[in-house]
């Protein structure tokens, strides 16, 4: 399996978290409710999604699950890839 095969289409949305939890910025990105991944999972992707669109906008992007030893898993999408704006 090539590294690119580890990526899959994931629908995410922008939101303002109730607590920062050590992350930077006002607007964050998370998986949408009812999808494969829990909404508590952080998404690392292009800042364009959180800066240039209204809060609540949904996107489809290519992402992979990064499993960190000791927890702290997150979804990663290369910042240079285009995301599809869904709403």
Spans of model-derived segments:
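OB-fold/S1-family single-stranded nucleic acid-binding modules
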Residues: 66-87
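Short glycine-rich, polar/acidic loop-and-turn segments at beta strand-coil junctions
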Residues: 33, 47, 63-67
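Flexible glycine-rich surface loops and low-complexity tracts that mediate binding to linear polymers
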Residues: 56-70
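Structural detector for short beta-strands of small beta-barrel domains
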Residues: 2-22
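A generic structural signal for short beta-strands and their flanking turns/coil linkers
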Residues: 25, 39, 55-59, 77-81
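Beta-strand/loop nucleic-acid-binding surfaces
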Residues: 36-52
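Short, surface-exposed loop motifs enriched in S/T, G, D/E and P with embedded aromatic residues
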Residues: 12, 18, 43, 61-63
